[in-house]
Amino acid sequence: MRVLRNFTIFFLFTALSLFRQISASAGDLHPVYVSCVNRCIENKCHGNPSDTSKLPLDLKLFRWDCGSNCGYECEITAENYFAAHNLPSQQYHGKWYFIRVFGIQELFSVFFSMLNFMIHYNGYHIMRRCIPDEHPAKRLCLSWAIVGMNAWVWSSVFHIRDTPITEKLDYFSAGAFVLFGSYCTLILMLRLDQLPGGKLLCWIIGVIFIAAFIAHVSYLSFYSFDYGYNMKANVAVGLVQNILWYYYSWSNRNSGLYWTRWPAYIVTSLMLATSLELFDFSPIANLIDAHALWHLSTVPITHYLYGFVVRKCSYDLTKGTFKIKAYDSSR
């Protein structure tokens, strides 16, 4: 349990450090950047930053306008200034400068987000094929994969083009995935649906989770888009989920089944992957940063997640954990 305590502390430290990084942004406050943007809007946009008439097709396609394009071009100007004066690169509105490719802001983050979508898509079909229809949690597991696919779709969209709308859709979808993952973990690990009155209990917990998500989204949408609150909410829910996964591995440590250790390995790997954000650095070749590498690292982790779910659900049936008709393992 000491290992669990240490990794819990590490997880909290890493997550809170991420919030400090998100909040800090010196580049867009630098006089070189500010004066450049003002001149660009005045001279190129003729005072109308929403104009798109002179932009190439790829920028129009991804909803760039003259003002946002000025911001991008002035990031280049500011970065050249910093390099000429031996100053470190800076972040702009919470992000590093990236080379834009055909209107796409963060090419590798988009690509790695799409890889994550594919691994969830593949996981969906593996579970659909390998989890027996008799398992009462099969639909829940499939829904988990669908929520995951949705989250990575909006992650891809957000990294293609960062706007207030795509940012909210990315954050809200990620929050839904974390919350729904915690709900699924409660059901799968603790088998709440097999308790007396378990179906009602699961329904009540589901309603509470849905109400919490609606309240969370409403607060961020209509009151204040508070990055700190959003981070803390996701950390709290994620921490509960991680503890449950660790508990499952610990409680089955003497089972003799190698795959019961996977939840602990998965959570530990996820925490280590998240630490990439803690050691943030300016993008390599202005294309790949720590955030992109974090997206890449979650691909193999998710693969093992679905592998574990399939094994556990099959084991539940063969060992009679669920009170249903006998499962024919030869199918």
Curated annotation (Swiss-Prot):
The protein's matches in InterPro entries, at most eight in alphabetical order, are given as: Per1-like
Subcellular localization(s) per the UniProt record: Endoplasmic reticulum membrane; Vacuole membrane
Recorded GO MF terms: hydrolase activity, acting on ester bonds
The record's GO CC annotations read: endoplasmic reticulum membrane; fungal-type vacuole membrane
What this protein is reported to do is described as: Involved in the lipid remodeling steps of GPI-anchor maturation. Lipid remodeling steps consist in the generation of 2 saturated fatty chains at the sn-2 position of GPI-anchors proteins. Required for phospholipase A2 activity that removes an acyl-chain at the sn-2 position of GPI-anchors during the remodeling of GPI. Required for efficient transport of GPI-anchor proteins.
Q: Which family does it belong to?
A: Belongs to the PGAP3/PER1 family.
Question: What is the name listed in the Swiss-Prot or TrEMBL entry for this protein?
Answer: Protein PER1 homolog
